[in-house]
Amino acid sequence: MDLPWNDERSNKFITNVGLITTNGPYGADVMACEWTHHVSYRPGLIAVCIGPNKATHENIKQTKEFGVNLCSTDQSIMSSVAGGYTGSRYNKINALKELGFEFYEAKKIKATMIKGAA
């Protein structure tokens, strides 16, 4: 996917938290990632920084797949839950579903995606 200069979709990277979704040894998981950066327009590339001792890192290492969901302005609670707990001990997806957040299955990868995210 190419993102031409001044494309409206690029503006979503300015201040949004990235929610990284995975599905692997730790099950379906979501992690808040402040370090989600738009690095190229053509091709459209995103860089994320994930610590090596995180459940998300292990899920990605095992499956080679992850989803990047950019928080919408009404998803600050989701960001707090995703960033405040470890996926190795807590099922954050189920907790967020109980809070009313919705998810869907991605078309090309096995990671769960967040409904309403950019």
Regions found by a protein language model. Name each.
Residues 1-118:
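Active-site-proximal mixed secondary-structure blocks
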